[in-house]
Curated annotation (Swiss-Prot):
GO terms under biological process: translation
A Pfam family of this chain: Ribosomal_L32p
Keyword Ribosomal protein: yes
Compositional bias per record (Basic residues), positions renumbered to this chain: 7-18
GO CC terms in record: large ribosomal subunit
Protein name stated in the entry: Large ribosomal subunit protein bL32
NCBIfam families hit by this protein: rpmF_bact (TIGR01031)
Family: Belongs to the bacterial ribosomal protein bL32 family.
Gene Ontology molecular function, alphabetical: structural constituent of ribosome
Annotated source species: Chlorobaculum parvum (strain DSM 263 / NCIMB 8327)
Region (Disordered): 1-20
Amino acid sequence: MANPKAKMSKSRRDKRRAQFNARTKAAVTVVCPNCGEPTLPHRACRHCGHYKGRQVTGKVVVA
């Protein structure tokens, strides 16, 4: 059987495991009810600045 030549730290182990999850999970988006643009869930819309029906940030110009 194969044996490890040196101890692998938890940090190195977790960095290696993170690569699999980064590649397999697709970005989840929802449609903003105010402007109809796709945005991340539970966050203010990057296009119009609305969250839960309220204006929370200024309008951002996305180039």
